[in-house]
């Protein structure tokens, strides 16, 4: 973050506004609305500033002279809207020397703080800022948020504030209170408030509080959530909602690290590994951990790359939950195969090239790779091999032994759907050498089939040659140094 967001309590505190123009009036009114006492410093005032003095006679004052050093003494903050560079620079230097927060309108170089665009549903407030880089964009974002937040949210927040101490007295643990408030804001109480029935909303809150007080079952729940192939924009709404609700998150290295920033800030985060052939926790230990945490009353998010039921061991994990009577939800996702194929421009099916598609795994429970058991492989189908990067030579050989010709089109899609995505295409027999030369970062999917020939014309996603790895913990091929990204003429490399 370029700036640390903070809300100041200015009730009864003195603030200085330098300038007597329309901008000074607008900024001064914002301060007055926040409960501040202001002094406008300018030889003359425009009509808007005069209006402020009349409407706020006890809290808005005028000092009819040009700014001089020392006039800012004792101010909680200073806002300069003089419109004169020399004055603005002098104000900034003086305030900086004295440690007084100062903002200069449209001059970010003369600011020690910035004023955001605000959506006001007091006591609920949303602040949006571009850090001074694009104020118009910040205002447009504010306009969009304005349409999403009903004005009744302010009354709902005020009602919650009035009941907060009562709730704290009845529900002693933070987890109980969190569960209660989530049900309030996502249930009948909120709906009643939005419909204008405030009395009914309060009754619904009190009834829910009585039920929660009587509740003795502190058993938690497990959310088995697919994180998708890597791009956070491909998350489902339900996945995002549960990520914000979880008390603890168990995640593997196939879930892009950027996704963890979308998890509730105070949620405990537990890495459980899972990169090629290496596991921070064995699968059995992960299963036991889910049961242990849920039995302790926690809402547990199991965040898995791709879809939990496609080579994600989701079935193994929920078997133990069922055995122990732990409630759970499964949230599907855009699969790694779907995401990689779509972003690489490789259709999985096509009327002219592939009438079927099969998903295979390059990783077996007991280590042995035996793709031949799924033979014969046909040239008019698309094969997607998960976790095949490490053993790509074996994958290539077994697919050829199963019926595919050496020149069958094939591709490796690395870090799919992220800015670091790379696509390597080559005949099946040559793909392992091409991938080794490219030193892919992983994770990667292998796509084999005639539809790969369409990639040059259908590839639409342009990754960044200098992008940082999207999965920095995933590592390189065994025994190889970590690659350094260098600019390339294109994000697709072909043999």
From Swiss-Prot:
Asked whether the keyword Phosphoprotein is assigned, the reply is yes
Residues that, per the record, bind S-adenosyl-L-methionine: 229, 305-307, 310, 335-336, 387, 416
Name of this protein: Siroheme synthase 2
Which organism does this sequence originate in?
Answer: Halorhodospira halophila (strain DSM 244 / SL1) (Ectothiorhodospira halophila (strain DSM 244 / SL1))
One example of the protein's molecular function in GO is: uroporphyrin-III C-methyltransferase activity
An individual GO BP term: cobalamin biosynthetic process
Q: Which residues lie within the region annotated Uroporphyrinogen-III C-methyltransferase?
A: 220-495
List, alphabetically, the InterPro entries matched.
4pyrrol_Mease (IPR000878), 4pyrrol_Methylase_sf (IPR035996), 4pyrrole_Mease_sub1 (IPR014777), 4pyrrole_Mease_sub2 (IPR014776), CobA/CysG_C (IPR006366), NAD(P)-bd_dom_sf (IPR036291), Siro_Cobalamin_biosynth (IPR050161), Sirohaem_synt_dimer_dom_sf (IPR037115)
What is catalysed by this protein?
Answer: uroporphyrinogen III + 2 S-adenosyl-L-methionine = precorrin-2 + 2 S-adenosyl-L-homocysteine + H(+); precorrin-2 + NAD(+) = sirohydrochlorin + NADH + 2 H(+); siroheme + 2 H(+) = sirohydrochlorin + Fe(2+)
Q: Where is this region: Precorrin-2 dehydrogenase /sirohydrochlorin ferrochelatase?
A: 1-205
Query: For the region Disordered, what residue ranges are annotated?
Result: 471-495
Q: Which family does it belong to?
A: In the N-terminal section; belongs to the precorrin-2 dehydrogenase / sirohydrochlorin ferrochelatase family.
Where NAD(+) binds, per the record, is at 22-23, 43-44
